[in-house]
Amino acid sequence: MNVLLGGFVIFATFVTLCNASCSFIPNERFPGDSTRECTDLKGNKHPINSKWKTDNCERCTCYKTEIICCTLIATPVGYDKKKCQRIFKKEDCKYIVVEKKNPKKTCPIDQWIL
């Protein structure tokens, strides 16, 4: 059991370091444990099969064996970087791209990454 958990932690770390759009958090279980909830990284409890949005713009789901959190943020990369700048709107979990000289005017975007 410890070997499996250790392997999973290494895998989760690898996925996170690779700038993945999702991260995996093992749900700690002990023999005889019948807990029907997950504990997130802030210590909050969530029922199995529940979903929630985090403060850092991730959508998380609690499963029996793990919590999976995936980013909700699409990052614009295909725009005129000399003429425009991207601005992150945390309240909406999204970027907007506006002209540097006239921030009221948006710029066209042709590529996004998750």
From Swiss-Prot:
Disulfide bonds join C22-C70, C38-C62, C57-C93, C60-C69, C84-C107. Pfam families: PSP94 (PF05825). The keyword Signal applies. One of its GO terms (cellular component) is extracellular region. Keywords: Disulfide bond, Secreted, Signal. This is Beta-microseminoprotein. It comes from the Eukaryota. Homodimer; Interacts with PI16. It comes from Macaca mulatta. Residues 1-20 form the signal peptide. Gene3D superfamilies: 2.20.25.590, Complement Module, domain 1. It is found in: Secreted. The keyword DNA-binding does not apply. The lineage of its organism: Eukaryota, Metazoa, Chordata, Craniata, Vertebrata. Belongs to the beta-microseminoprotein family.
